[in-house]
């Protein structure tokens, strides 16, 4: 099946859903739709430096340490390893009907936030403060996770896109007002 056929098939499937069924698929813990033969799927998995949680996997250095090497090829290679391990875990677990959190093929990785404020407790997840390096390593990791073939090995979901450097405890209500210059210079 090529991309055009896959898109057509997906559109036909969604057309068979009612509004509530379609809306439920937008949550990270999408329920099964038995009448359409769609199994449940949990979109929440992480692979910031290897596949996180749900069993054993290779753990690589944190992204900030990988960035210190300035090696796009190695970062892509680590993404390839993570997606291979993630796919193997997914295949084994889904055959047993285990589709819980941290067991899917959608990885909330990489973290492409530009690390500007050292008070943010998650800076180690990023590629640092340089927008160019963050861009290049983020793209390399995504290429590694998703693969270069006709079909995706896994789905990368870049997170914490812009102006997300904390403080972490207040992230859901902290009201930041960066200047247009700062946004253009460092974030987009």
For the regions a language model picked out, list residue spans one by one.
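Glycoside hydrolase catalytic-domain context in secreted enzymes
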Residues: 1-187
């Amino acid at each position: 099946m090529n991309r055009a056929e896959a898109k057509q098939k997906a559109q036909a499937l969604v057309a068979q859903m009612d509004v509530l069924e379609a809306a439920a698929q937008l949550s990270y813990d999408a329920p099964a739709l038995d009448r359409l033969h769609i199994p449940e799927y949990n979109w929440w998995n992480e692979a910031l430096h290897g596949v996180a949680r749900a069993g054993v996997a290779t753990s690589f250095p944190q992204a900030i340490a990988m960035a210190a090497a300035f090696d796009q090829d190695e970062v892509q290679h680590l993404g390839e390893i993570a997606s291979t391990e993630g796919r193997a875990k997914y295949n084994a677990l889904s055959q047993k009907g285990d589709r819980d959190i941290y067991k899917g093929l959608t990885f909330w990785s990489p973290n492409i936030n530009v690390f500007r404020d050292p008070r943010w407790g998650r800076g180690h997840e990023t590629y640092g403060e340089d927008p160019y390096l963050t861009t290049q390593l983020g793209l390399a990791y995504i290429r590694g996770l998703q693969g270069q073939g006709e079909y995706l090995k896994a789905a990368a979901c870049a997170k914490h896109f812009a102006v997300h450097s904390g403080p972490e405890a207040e992230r859901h209500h902290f009201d930041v007002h960066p200047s247009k210059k700062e946004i253009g210079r460092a974030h987009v």
